[in-house]
Amino acid sequence: MNRLLSLFQLCDSNFPSGSFSHSFGLETYIQEKVITDKESFKNAISVYIRKQLFFTEGLACILAYEAMEKNEPSALVELDHILFASNVAQETRSGNQRMGERMAKLCVDLYPSPILIEYTNRIKEKKAYGHSAIVFAIVAYHLKVTKETAVGAYLFANVSALVQNAVRGIPIGQTDGQRILVEIQPLLEEGVRTISQLPKEDLGAVSPGMEIAQMRHERLNVRLFMS
């Protein structure tokens, strides 16, 4: 139980990783009136989950966990570099880097482990960029949480943060936000099964539409979010 409670802490949208500052391109769709209410946001976030989250952070999280199972810590830095290089939008790329660096610093204090200390040192030495998916996987492995639970929790944490940002950005009501989190759970369960079967070569295979929205975000006249 204590292990799960520790993992829940990382999934809390109040965990100060900086995720509250990022919409990952969804703000572009809000300003263009593609997203206007609960249903349009739910549709958009479902596309984001299926076409981007599964193939980037979700797959990286499970690959990082498997690398530690195989005692291949050097693979974590390789994954870190692939995640950074495959992120086309500058705002999203730098946002993920800042969030990863911040999360690594917090977790090395809260849940220290030799692997996390080494990864954090690599970030400090500029030999790694930092990414929350890798930090989350390291902490989950250290806590001896199962691989499937780890990736499911990581997907939920990402979606929960985006829903909270939608409450502010669209806006939608808090109750509608919680309804989305309930309604989206079958998709996240599907995601765990899907990601478990993806090869490493699929890492970064995302929808260009989402990437274009993330790049266009840089030129919006008014922005609530950093990406």
UniProtKB/Swiss-Prot annotation:
Keywords: Chaperone, Cytoplasm, Nickel insertion
Location(s), subcellular: Cytoplasm
Listed GO MF terms: nickel cation binding
Family according to the record: Belongs to the UreF family.
Span of the signal peptide: none
Gene Ontology, cellular component aspect: cytoplasm
Function: Required for maturation of urease via the functional incorporation of the urease nickel metallocenter.
One protein family per Pfam: UreF
Protein's recorded name: Urease accessory protein UreF
Assembly and oligomerization: UreD, UreF and UreG form a complex that acts as a GTP-hydrolysis-dependent molecular chaperone, activating the urease apoprotein by helping to assemble the nickel containing metallocenter of UreC. The UreE protein probably delivers the nickel.
The organism's place on the tree of life at top rank: Bacteria
Species of the source: Bacillus sp. (strain TB-90)
